[in-house]
């Protein structure tokens, strides 16, 4: 499994609906990049200049909303993930 460093998290993307509310099927070219995901791994936190480590506010299993163009896409063992910093996370769902 991927283990992120510092204040980074690894998320699995949650795909958006392929149909609109009225039943129109959207082609891949019309879909926007997902902005929702589930955290599958979290780093140990960021280190302050004093050397003190600050734990992350999010944890494994959290569903999150993140900035549209944030993170780095990676493919690991056939699954696509996104690695991003905690500061790119906008909200935790639920």
UniProtKB/Swiss-Prot annotation:
<keyword id="KW-0143">Chaperone</keyword>
<dbReference type="Pfam" id="PF00166">
    <property type="entry name" value="Cpn10"/>
</dbReference>
<comment type="function">
    <text>Together with the chaperonin GroEL, plays an essential role in assisting protein folding. The GroEL-GroES system forms a nano-cage that allows encapsulation of the non-native substrate proteins and provides a physical environment optimized to promote and accelerate protein folding. GroES binds to the apical surface of the GroEL ring, thereby capping the opening of the GroEL channel.</text>
</comment>
<dbReference type="GO" id="GO:0051087">
    <property type="term" value="F:protein-folding chaperone binding"/>
</dbReference>
<dbReference type="InterPro" id="IPR037124">
    <property type="entry name" value="Chaperonin_GroES_sf"/>
</dbReference>
<comment type="similarity">
    <text>Belongs to the GroES chaperonin family.</text>
</comment>
<dbReference type="GO" id="GO:0005524">
    <property type="term" value="F:ATP binding"/>
</dbReference>
<dbReference type="GO" id="GO:0044183">
    <property type="term" value="F:protein folding chaperone"/>
</dbReference>
<dbReference type="InterPro" id="IPR018369">
    <property type="entry name" value="Chaprnonin_Cpn10_CS"/>
</dbReference>
<dbReference type="GO" id="GO:0046872">
    <property type="term" value="F:metal ion binding"/>
</dbReference>
<dbReference type="GO" id="GO:0051082">
    <property type="term" value="F:unfolded protein binding"/>
</dbReference>
<dbReference type="GO" id="GO:0051085">
    <property type="term" value="P:chaperone cofactor-dependent protein refolding"/>
</dbReference>
<dbReference type="InterPro" id="IPR011032">
    <property type="entry name" value="GroES-like_sf"/>
</dbReference>
<protein>
    <recommendedName>
        <fullName>Co-chaperonin GroES</fullName>
    </recommendedName>
</protein>
<keyword id="KW-0963">Cytoplasm</keyword>
<comment type="subunit">
    <text>Heptamer of 7 subunits arranged in a ring. Interacts with the chaperonin GroEL.</text>
</comment>
<keyword id="KW-0346">Stress response</keyword>
<dbReference type="GO" id="GO:0005737">
    <property type="term" value="C:cytoplasm"/>
</dbReference>
<dbReference type="InterPro" id="IPR020818">
    <property type="entry name" value="Chaperonin_GroES"/>
</dbReference>
